[in-house]
């Protein structure tokens, strides 16, 4: 039986099921086997995943997951579930599902749930404001393939990005302004997840703009319309325009791994620079993460704070929490969905 409601799948990267070595290993193997994530040749990717990462990394990072795990499980999944539930209350005309690219609940499970309800119209929304092939692109492609297999006649609509949408910018500004971390800091850092430079250059069809031209990210044009770094830059520019920060600020990138050259400046280099300038109190906003997760709660709030305090003579480096389930964020996001149909 056909359902007149619209299906909506909130897409995200995913999380291990448990803070255990086997669970982390399973998740990492699935995550890093994606050619959009490690975009090397198939044999090199296999060697990296199975000979370098899988045997050793799960044990090394187990304590990181243990340090952020809650009674409700993974913070990313718990926040996603609460957000989905709150969104559903505001959007009774939609059936909303969570679909993780890797791990559970999977995109396949989300699609099958909608199929069983007789849904024939699905809206895909990656919960990444700034577009990157390794995140939004991979999620969208996987979801489209699964939908075509499970519901061949389904109409699909996609929201690829929302990095400069007014509702998103206003929510970020409100979150920062109301945070004690910002009110007490001497410096505001905007930290985004990093990417290898080659992934940025690959989406520049002109091959002559991204990371080639001076100030290549300052304005959006045909060459950088899908450039992740340009999206991050535009997000910060728009936030700062409304925020009118009372302290100095800058942008940086985090979560670098491997030997490839990644987009810069890297957060570790920025922390050293701030220390050399005598800055002691730093607040960090992470606009690329709509939900708090390992990269915010452990990498920023624990690991980078410890480095800044213990090695760089800082007083603190504090995380400004992500938007998560703030009422104004849920409400504005629901209205954004309505406008997008």
Model segments located where?
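Active-site-proximal alpha-helix that buttresses catalytic centers in soluble enzyme cores
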Residues: 2-341
């Amino acid at each position: 039986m056909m359902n007149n409601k619209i299906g909506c799948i909130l897409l995200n990267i995913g999380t291990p099921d448990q803070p255990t070595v086997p669970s982390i290993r399973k998740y990492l193997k699935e995550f890093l086997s994606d050619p959009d994530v490690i975009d090397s040749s198939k044999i090199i990717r296999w060697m990296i995943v199975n000979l370098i990462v899988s045997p050793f990394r799960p044990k090394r990072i187990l304590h990181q997951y243990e340090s952020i795990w809650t009674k409700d499980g993974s913070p990313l999944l718990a926040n996603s579930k609460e957000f989905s539930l709150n969104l559903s209350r505001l959007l009774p005309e939609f059936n909303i599902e969570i679909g993780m690219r890797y791990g559970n609940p999977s995109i396949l499970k989300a699609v099958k749930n909608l199929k069983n309800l007789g849904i024939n119209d699905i809206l895909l929304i990656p919960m990444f404001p700034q577009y990157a092939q390794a995140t939004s692109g991979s999620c969208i492609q996987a979801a489209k393939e699964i939908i075509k297999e499970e519901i061949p006649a389904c109409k699909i609509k996609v929201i690829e990005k929302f990095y400069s949408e007014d509702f998103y910018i206003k929510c970020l500004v409100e979150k920062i302004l109301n945070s004690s971390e910002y009110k007490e800091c001497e410096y505001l850092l905007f930290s985004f997840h990093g990417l290898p430079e080659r992934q940025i250059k690959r989406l520049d069809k002109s091959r002559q703009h991204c990371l080639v031209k001076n100030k290549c990210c300052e304005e959006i044009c045909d060459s950088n319309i899908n450039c992740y770094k340009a999206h991050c830059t535009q997000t910060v520019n728009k936030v700062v325009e409304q925020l009118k920060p009372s302290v100095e600020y800058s942008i940086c990138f985090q979560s670098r791994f491997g030997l490839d050259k990644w987009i810069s400046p890297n957060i570790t280099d920025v922390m050293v620079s701030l220390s050399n300038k005598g800055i002691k109190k730093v607040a960090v906003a992470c606009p690329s993460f709509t939900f708090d997760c390992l990269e915010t709660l452990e990498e920023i709030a624990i690991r980078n704070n410890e480095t800044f305090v213990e090695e760089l003579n800082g007083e603190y480096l504090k995380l400004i929490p992500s938007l998560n389930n703030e009422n104004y964020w849920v409400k504005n996001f629901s209205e954004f969905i309505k406008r997008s149909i």
